[in-house]
């Protein structure tokens, strides 16, 4: 039978193999080995350099086994803490997302919703009151639109009068203005008896009861002031002028007229002072006209 490999005569002896194994162990542990043959020393130095090149950093910088175990345990503990912190952060973020979504649902709750009680408890009372008023006003406005569509103009007018007073209680300006615009539009439809009527440009922003002056565009009649009663001075002027015109005047006598618009002018000679004449019939108990005073001609 043919044998493969080296023949038995070519195999090294066991003691040489043992010596080589001991040499490799000594080089691995960086132990100093002395050889009698210089060639063996050179070979040992070459193998030691090769060992140092393969081990980087060098073996002198390697840590001990205890230090390696301590570093491994510290790394594992740090990874566990990091995982716990990430889990805590994730749970907090999930809770915030849930709360924010729930808060948004509560904030958007309206009267009649399941969460409206919680909405009323969390938010201010004015907003809750506005929600109730707006909901009631919109329901009444929808009823008014139905009355207009059916031609019930009188009922729609009465309902609009009630809604107009209710809208003013809304504290939110934007929501109140929206309701006012709807009320004005329905007022226009009721006044014109036209379900398809629209708001006229320049219509008032505040709602008024249908048919009232504030909600109509008909021009108002001009205001006529009552005549003022004549003053005593003006009543005395006709009697004085009548007395002067009826009295015979000579040709040489110049007619003198006192102008009421210039009271500061001095009377000419022969004129009559109005203050000396009686003012009206109330000062004459007999009810007769005042006696005429003769005017002497001027020379």
UniProtKB/Swiss-Prot annotation:
Keywords in alphabetical order: Cell membrane, Membrane, Transcription, Transcription regulation, Transmembrane, Transmembrane helix
Organism field: Mycobacterium tuberculosis (strain ATCC 25618 / H37Rv)
Effect of residue 50 to A: 10-fold reduction in binding to SigD
Keyword Transcription recorded: yes
Region Disordered: start-end pairs: 187-299
Classification via Pfam families: RsdA_SigD_bd
Topology in membrane: Single-pass membrane protein
Subcellular location: Cell membrane
Maturation and modification: The cytosolic fragment (residues 1-94) in both free and SigD-associated form, is degraded by a ClpP1-ClpP2-ClpX complex, as would be expected after S1P and S2P intramembrane proteolysis. This releases SigD so that it may bind to the RNA polymerase catalytic core.
Record keyword Ligase present: no
Region (Interaction with sigma factor): 24-50
Function: An anti-sigma factor for extracytoplasmic function (ECF) sigma factor SigD. ECF sigma factors are held in an inactive form by an anti-sigma factor until released by regulated intramembrane proteolysis (RIP). RIP occurs when an extracytoplasmic signal triggers a concerted proteolytic cascade to transmit information and elicit cellular responses.
GO cellular component: extracellular region; plasma membrane
Protein known as: Anti-sigma-D factor RsdA
UniProt biased composition (Low complexity): 201-212, 250-271
Transmembrane regions: 86-106
Signals that turn on the gene: Positively regulated by alternative sigma factor SigD.
Cytoplasmic topological intervals: 1-85
Record topology, Extracellular segments: 107-299
Subunit structure: Interacts with ECF RNA polymerase sigma factor SigD; this should inhibit the interaction of SigD with the RNA polymerase catalytic core.
Domain remark in the UniProt entry: The cytosolic domain interacts with ECF sigma factor SigD.
